[in-house]
Design a protein with these regions (language model features):
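ABC ATP-binding cassette signature C-motif
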Residues: 1-92, 146-380
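Flexible nucleotide-interacting loop at or near the entrance of a catalytic core
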Residues: 83-174
């Protein structure tokens, strides 16, 4: 996707399967504009709600064993489909009440000669009533609810002059910031390697070359790494894998957390090393729920998740009463979760108490971002 200029010349239809995967926010924004201005047909599969809202004029909903087409974007589809189900359920409820009323009349008066005609008429009316067939949805939403064991105090995290170089590349250069007890901080921008390294340092998996950091005495941390390979490089089954992170060792208790993440029945005896990418992410989220920390460090937690799981995670983080440091390339996820934005640029740190949309819309910050993200070695 680096050289797209030729794409629109001869393509009548673009078929795009998860085109935003592995793209950063700037590349996704470029792709959105390209597709909006593309004059021919685009058929796209994506789990990025903001992207679908920006690009799509129609939504094909594959559910209930059929395809239903909706005119409008993702939000319109969601509201319309939920309204349709609600209306069908309400209509069925009214029909069921009518059926009960007719059945009671027939039962009372079918043997009564003076009421027999009325009873016969109601039998005919009863035969004409048909309930709408509401098939169970193929969509399953996990239940994600992070409940800290301990309330967080005012002193959360102080990062002081941290620097880190890896294989000759300076990833972090004199990084300093303080985290408050109400902060939900999104780390954004193209320098994702720097964010990952910072999170590893704060989680105790790496050491800084210079500088230091200090967690408050009331804090407990839960870390979700971008690469979870080593977490599952063992022969444990899912239940045993999760039990090692739980103070309560009762199998029924542990299975309850797996059930929240849609693991059922024999899923619990699967070996973790054979799980899919999405299943491993759901296991990691189960781990965070069962550990119950009051500070979450989440590096690209929506990777490998389906739309329903992303929505559930999004809602769970919005409700979370603790501190969150996270990164994500999902615009809506960042916009609805974060109340503070930090960008680690090539030449320093931008830190703003704001939403992501406000951050992007700020012209002064946009100029600052452009200057600070220039490659200082190859600057024109």
């Amino acid at each position: 996707w680096c050289d797209h200029g030729h794409m629109g010349i001869c393509a009548d239809v673009l078929l795009l399967d998860e085109p935003t995967n592995h793209l950063d926010m700037d590349a996704i924004a470029w792709l959105e504009e390209f597709l909006i201005n593309f004059e021919n047909t685009v058929i796209v599969v994506s789990h990025d709600r903001y992207f679908l809202n920006k690009v799509c004029t129609q939504i094909a909903d594959i559910d209930y064993a059929k395809i239903q087409l909706y005119a409008g974007n993702y939000d319109f589809w969601y509201e319309s489909s939920q309204l349709m189900i609600k209306q069908m359920k309400e209509a069925n409820k009214k029909k069921e009440e009518k059926i009960k009323e007719l059945q009671e009349f027939i039962q009372r008066f079918s043997a009564n000669a003076s009421k027999s005609k009325q009873a016969t008429s109601r039998k005919r009316a009863l035969e004409k009533i048909e309930l709408d067939d509401i098939k169970p949805s193929s969509r399953k939403y996990p239940y994600i609810d992070f409940r800290p064991k301990r309330e967080i105090g005012n002193e959360v995290l102080t990062v002081s002059h941290i620097s880190k170089t890896v294989e000759g590349e300076k990833l972090l250069d004199d990084v300093s910031f303080t985290v408050g007890h109400d902060d939900k901080i999104a780390f954004v921008g193209p320098n994702t390697k720097a964010t990952t390294m910072l999170f590893k340092i704060l989680a105790g998996e790496e050491k800084p070359d210079e500088g230091s950091f200090k967690w408050g005495v009331t804090t407990s941390q839960g870390y979700f790494p971008k690469d979870n390979t080593k977490e599952f490089d063992n022969d444990l089954i899912i239940v045993d894998w999760l039990t090692q992170y739980s103070e309560e060792k009762d199998a029924t208790y542990v299975r309850g957390f797996l059930g929240r993440m849609l693991f059922a029945g024999d899923d619990g005896v699967k070996k973790v090393k054979v799980l899919s990418g999405g299943e491993k992410v759901r296991c990691m989220l189960s781990k965070l729920m069962i550990m119950a920390p009051n500070c979450l460090i989440l590096d690209e937690p929506t990777n490998h998740l389906d739309m329903e799981s992303i929505t559930a995670l999004n809602n769970g983080l919005i409700k979370f009463p603790g501190v969150i440091l996270f990164s994500s390339q999902d615009h809506q996820f960042v916009q609805t979760t974060a109340n503070r934005i930090i960008e680690l640029t090539n030449t320093g740190l931008i830190d703003k108490q704001t939403t992501y949309d406000e951050y992007l819309a700020n012209d002064e910050l946009a100029r600052k971002r452009q200057i600070m993200n220039m490659d200082v070695d190859g600057e024109d």
